[in-house]
Amino acid sequence: MQNKFGFILVKPQLGENIGACARSMKNFGFNKLHIVEPKINFPNHKAKATSVGAYDIINKAKVYNNVENAVSKFNLIVSLSARRRDINKKHISLQDFQKILTSKRNLNIGLMFGPEASGLSNKDLSFSNYILQIPTSAKFKSLN
């Protein structure tokens, strides 16, 4: 199941964030990391240091100049956003996402996360099939 998923970080601002993402991915058996327009030079020592044992994910990460190229590697894009958006994209819950995974087994799925400070733009979201909202604390909604 893990090989079906790739993680797309759009305009990450900190090497530490990329490293923490790689480490979390490795904890759960994921290994496909795609990075769009990193705001820092990548790979860098901070990303590697924060990834601890996930150097393989950092070293194999693919870097893209734009979202369109990054998402072209997948046939389903699910964006994660803490904010509800007024755009023509279906917002889904975790339960909805589970149903999609069960009904469409042969998908190559990209999970897209936005920049740390601002989240995904509406333009970034336009490349998504769905927007997934994971329940979080009302006081701190950011997942990235």
Model-inferred region functions:
Residues M1-N144:
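Post-transcriptional modification and biogenesis factors for structured RNAs
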